[in-house]
């Protein structure tokens, strides 16, 4: 995000350098391009700031959701002295805490998604994607809560745990299917959010269209 902000600052500087302030009298926050197009830098800068802040919030959600994949890698394993993980019969079918951790992570992600559709300056398309991602997070949480007989205990089996949090498992009937759908929704939301940032920046950097030469002599 720091690199993105630095790029935005540099873009604003380039706009100031490249814009022609001649012609009609401009307000303090306005600059004119060489074709006479007037840019309201205050409005454009606000749009970039809002889009960047929204994208950063979505990135936090994505990081949380993707972290469940890392938890899934620890199913039925223990830590070795060298810091790596290995399967161990003594630790087999003891995944209750692992499932609880994954559940809590998605619960936090759901909380972060709430209210994102109320953020200033975001498009209706983005609002719809936020709503979809939030619905997918609720679906996962509801699915896992409905499986407490097998998942809500200390000795949750490796097989049941994979069905719950391993989204590439062959059997996804205890939550993994909903988790996969949540990942897809969050990926789409992040892509759209980053697209809004790029669009806002492009508003500053879009080249001026060359005027067609007049055919009237």
Swiss-Prot record:
Protein location: Cell outer membrane
Lipidated sites in chain (N-palmitoyl cysteine): 19
Stated family: Belongs to the variable small protein (Vsp) family.
UniProt-annotated stretches for the region Disordered: 151-174
InterPro entries assigned to the protein according to its UniProt record, in alphabetical order: Lipoprotein_OspC, OspC-like_sf
Signal sequence region: 1-18
PROSITE patterns, per database record: PROKAR_LIPOPROTEIN
Any further remark recorded for this protein: Genes for both Vlp and Vsp families are on (usually) unnamed linear plasmids in B.hermsii HS1.
Pfam family, one: Lipoprotein_6
Organism listed in the record: Borrelia hermsii
Superkingdom of source: Bacteria
Entry keyword set: Cell outer membrane, Lipoprotein, Membrane, Palmitate, Plasmid, Signal
Name of the featured protein: Variable small protein 22
Ranges of compositional bias, category Basic and acidic residues: 155-174
Lipidation (S-diacylglycerol cysteine): 19
Keyword Signal: yes
Job of this protein: The Vlp and Vsp proteins are antigenically distinct proteins, only one vlp or vsp gene is transcriptionally active at any one time. Switching between these genes is a mechanism of host immune response evasion.
Recorded GO CC terms: cell outer membrane
Membrane topology: Lipid-anchor
